[in-house]
């Protein structure tokens, strides 16, 4: 049936606020948009954690469930849950086949988690993944640097995804923004 691309996620910590945005497009192969309104950003752990995925949709649901289980196991400790999930993801033969990346965040910490065992905390409080991730990251950094006094975290997240959606064919303007 072809590869599905589940597109762009952007997250930012800014002036004591945090927000994560994701677009709604799911594309099969390089030619067909299958869905315009996929929800790729979710609140987890009683609304205290945000998680967003880019990659295979079915794989992402598996990873959301696994990460939420780790959050419960480690009582909401985001870093510990992310590290333990990455270890399990990398160490399990079946899980290694999953094709997705996650950004997870709470009010103080933001992490990129991948199946290669990477758990990365950005220096600047901004992360972006997916096919439009580079565009969203560049836009977000510029907005945070040059308009930081005038924009909220939610506004930076939404504007960054809008710019990515203008450039990347796998990113649309059906943007969902979640805040903590």
From Swiss-Prot:
Per the Swiss-Prot or TrEMBL record, the active site comprises 7
Q: Name one GO cellular component term.
A: proteasome core complex
- Please state how the activity of this protein is regulated: Allosterically activated by HslU binding.
Q: In the Enzyme Commission scheme, what number(s) does this protein have?
A: 3.4.25.2
| GO molecular function list | metal ion binding; threonine-type endopeptidase activity
Which reaction is recorded as catalysed by this protein?
ATP-dependent cleavage of peptide bonds with broad specificity
Q: Which CDD domains match?
A: protease_HslV
Classify the main location.
cytoplasm
Q: What is this protein called?
A: ATP-dependent protease subunit HslV
Source organism (scientific name) = Bacillus mycoides (strain KBAB4)
Q: What are the leading ranks of the lineage?
A: Bacteria, Bacillati, Bacillota, Bacilli, Bacillales
